[in-house]
Amino acid sequence: VCSASRASLMTGSYAERVGIQGALSPWAVNGLDPETETIAKLLKRHGYTNAIFGKWHLGHRYEYLPLQNGFDEYSGLICSNDMWPVDFDGIQIADTSSWRKKSYPQLPLIKDFDNNYSNLIF
């Protein structure tokens, strides 16, 4: 499952050992504890600069975000891809669900990334 798999990849531990079970919901109060060792923290201690791009889904509160877990740069979604109103074809759609409007900010659709690569953007 999403959050649990990411926690294991970031820490090298079973997800339950670092307090992550299943997929974190938008109202979750937990996340990847900043005291937990991550591959990014390990690499940073050895002189590497770390970046992560894409979906994080290991906690949306400040203390759980990528920059508090060893990464120097981050670009992506904090939660799941279904947590903001964009159609899978990349078309901005109106979101009518009241719980989603309360839980997530309305984000703009990112355009003009076709045929671009991260080394050209960042």
Residue ranges of predicted features:
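Formylglycine-dependent sulfatase
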Residues: 1-122
